[in-house]
Design a protein with these regions (language model features):
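Catalytic cores of DNA base-excision repair glycosylases
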Residues: 2-214
Length: 214
């Protein structure tokens, strides 16, 4: 649990300012979608997989299964074949069908809004739920993925490895208006500059205020 003090808060303010200057304040998920259900399915598929790979699969997937009901009654083997280029496709196909069935039985075929309802769906954890809450419903939420975990620790915003604790730490110090876009901005920073091995600190626009800069 990180201590909230003046030094940390000053760093938070400057980091958020520079992220907005570098990437813009209107960033949203990289997963292509046209509605809440498509984003839900795409996010389930994105676990342990790149967004670009998911975006290659979803156009034909949603053409074959255009509605919640189509997924709910899908043959698992056929769905597996449709998503076989994505990792863990056996488990994901089962979860997607179960998710669609629960949406039909419990939520009238609509994607629910609350965290509690979202995580009750098969294949949906806090990360996926917060992607939906932020990008679809504009509910302030923080998505903790591998990039957010790594870079938030490097910036001194958290000292935990637990995604729930990291989420709580960030909620205490980040301005609420920044919660949704912080994740997307940090993902881009992590993919291009602040990589897991060999971060490019000399190229980073945060190097002068980052406690971990080399």
């Amino acid at each position: 649990m990180i201590r909230k003090n003046k030094a940390v808060m000053n760093r938070v303010t400057e980091v958020c300012k520079r992220l907005d200057e570098q990437y813009g304040p209107d960033m949203r998920t990289y997963l292509d979608h046209r509605n809440a259900f498509e984003l839900l399915i795409a996010t389930i598929l994105s676990a342990q997989c790149t967004d670009s790979r998911v975006n290659m699969v979803t156009p034909s997937l949603f053409a074959k299964y255009p509605t919640v009901h189509d997924f709910a009654v899908a043959d698992v083997k056929e769905l597996e074949q449709a998503i076989h280029s994505i990792g863990f496709y056996h488990a994901k196909a089962k979860n997607i069908i179960g998710c669609a069935q629960k949406l039909e039985s419990d939520f009238e075929g609509q994607v629910p809004r609350t965290l509690e309802e979202l995580v009750s769906l098969p294949g949906v954890g806090r990360k996926t739920a917060n992607v939906i809450r932020g990008n679809i419903f504009e509910d302030p939420s923080i998505v903790v993925d591998t990039h957010v975990k790594r870079i938030s620790k490097r910036l001194g915003f958290t000292d935990s490895d637990d995604p729930v604790v990291i989420e709580q730490d960030l909620m205490k110090i980040l301005p609420k208006d920044n919660w949704i876009r912080y994740n997307i901005q940090i993902i881009y920073l992590g993919r291009t500059i602040c990589k897991a091995p060999n971060p490019k600190c000399e190229e980073c626009f945060l190097k002068d205020i980052c406690p971990s800069a080399k």
